[in-house]
Amino acid sequence: MQLVERPRLELSGAKLKLVLEDLVARSEEQGGVEAYVEALRIKCAMFQEVLQKEFQLREFRALCAHMSTVRRRIGQYAQAHWFGEMKKRVAALLDEDQDTDERIRRFCAAFPDDREHRWARDLAAELLHHAHPERYPLMTRWVWDARTNTGVLRELWHGDDVDGMTIDVPDSYTTFLVLREELAQYLSSNGVFRDVLLYVDVLMAQVYAGYIGERGGTYLRADFTTPEDPMLHTRRILGLDGIDQDGRSRLKAADGRAEVVE
């Protein structure tokens, strides 16, 4: 078995401290961080229930509605004429007989290699993570995208001139494992002892929510509009706003209409 070298992640303790304090303060009036952890637990249960069986198109669409960077772009790939092929691709992705990075690579390679299909990486990452949250850390582009040098990893990187540097760390399975491990250790050292892995997801979403609020451009604001409350960006990043009070899904059809979840 080939040994994989662990990347060295130079995370800023000062930045982590500020993010955690901000997360606790912002979520206090909405049930605290625990409310978001519980919502993620429910999301994981939903994914596991669907993906462990012969799922139907409407169920796959419901999952997509809870993936913030997928639902507006997946379009025709969440329609009936594409469903058979999509099920095959998802089955291959979840086949644990192969290397994780290779499965993700093959899944993404089945789609056109252009800007309009970068969501495929996020779809793969969300399916893996929420089907097996302990085995697979969250590996979406907003956590770390080596090609664009953006994501949570960059926002937490230690240094005075992070904006002017290229972080030479691959967006591999091992990198995401190490990142989750270090964030989990930080949370544990600050009094979090239960559901630590889900807390890591919420913490990372809060990091990226701060990025959107401060520096997010047109691309980001298409998905994350002006917040109505201090935790709106965080909920959207985590996909916890998949269905509104009228039963309308955040999933967009090929013609741009919102799907209705039955």
Where on the chain are the PLM-derived regions?
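An N-terminal alpha-helical hairpin/helix-loop-helix interaction module that forms a charged
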Residues: M1-E116, E134-W144, T148-E262
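Helix-hairpin-helix
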Residues: A110-H130
